[in-house]
């Protein structure tokens, strides 16, 4: 009964003020529902976040990392990974069905949802129309832990096929550091030059790391 009564606090706060009013601890407690023997759910949620550093660290962790957290078994781990996958698919559907005008923040959040946690480098492209509305997005190339082979010709071929006018490039660094490499800068220059011949504009190239990102446009490189 103690765990259930303590869970009412986040629930009541959510119903009164909205889900965004909850702290990370309260939101996690709402999901966990119950604590463990001798530990209420809010305490358990607090300890989990402290152990993993943040919600990001928690949702991108592997099962082996949960072995030191008492009260978290396979079922809860599977549920947590399910939440992360739901978020990724939500952004996927939103981008595909709403065809929104992209803000820098929405673009970053979408790309983080798609590329965070990947064990290999993935290179993807968001294709936009002349009004910078999303037409579609595609994972065009996949590579190894620290390298992905990118072919500008294939990017342009796909853009022409769907009548795109602008592109946003993106790839991840599984190592966690989002700082672009020399190779990242060189391939970006190659893609931009190739696109110019076809009247295609590259708006940005965003590199996704672990909890961080680098935007070529924000740094003035595009």
From Swiss-Prot:
Designated name of the protein: UPF0758 protein YicR
GO MF annotations in UniProt: metal ion binding; metallopeptidase activity
Disulphides: none
Organism in which the protein naturally occurs: Escherichia coli (strain 55989 / EAEC)
NCBIfam families: PRK00024.1, radc
The family this protein is said to belong to: Belongs to the UPF0758 family. YicR subfamily.
A GO biological-process term: proteolysis
Gene3D superfamilies noted in UniProt: Cytidine Deaminase, domain 2
PROSITE patterns hit by this protein: MPN, UPF0758
InterPro entries hit by this protein: MPN, RadC_JAB, RuvA_2-like, UPF0758, UPF0758_CS, UPF0758_N, UPF0758_YicR
Keywords: Hydrolase, Metal-binding, Metalloprotease, Protease, Zinc
Magnesium as UniProt keyword: no
One Pfam family this sequence matches: RadC
Binding site for Zn(2+): 171, 173, 184
Motif (JAMM motif): 171-184
Segments forming domain MPN: 100-222
């Amino acid at each position: 009964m103690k765990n259930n009564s303590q869970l009412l606090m986040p629930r009541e706060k959510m119903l009164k003020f909205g889900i965004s009013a909850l702290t990370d601890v309260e939101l996690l407690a709402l999901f966990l529902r119950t604590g463990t023997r001798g530990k209420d759910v809010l305490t358990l949620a607090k300890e989990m976040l402290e152990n993993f550093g943040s919600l990001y660290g928690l949702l991108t962790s592997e099962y082996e990392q949960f072995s030191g957290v008492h009260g978290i078994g396979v079922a809860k781990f599977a549920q947590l990974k399910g939440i992360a996958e739901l978020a990724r698919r939500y952004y996927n559907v939103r981008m595909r069905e709403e065809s929104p005008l992209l803000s820098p923040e929405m673009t970053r959040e979408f790309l983080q949802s798609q590329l965070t946690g990947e064990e290999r480098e993935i290179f993807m492209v968001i294709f936009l129309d002349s009004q910078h509305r999303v037409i579609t997005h595609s994972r065009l190339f996949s590579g190894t832990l620290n390298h992905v082979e990118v072919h500008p010709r294939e990017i342009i071929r796909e853009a022409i096929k769907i009548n795109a006018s602008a592109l946003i490039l993106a790839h991840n660094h599984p190592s966690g550091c989002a700082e672009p490499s020399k190779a990242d800068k060189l391939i970006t220059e190659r893609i931009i030059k190739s696109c110019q011949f076809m009247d295609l504009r590259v708006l940005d190239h965003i590199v996704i790391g672990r909890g961080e990102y680098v935007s070529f446009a924000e740094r003035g490189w595009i």
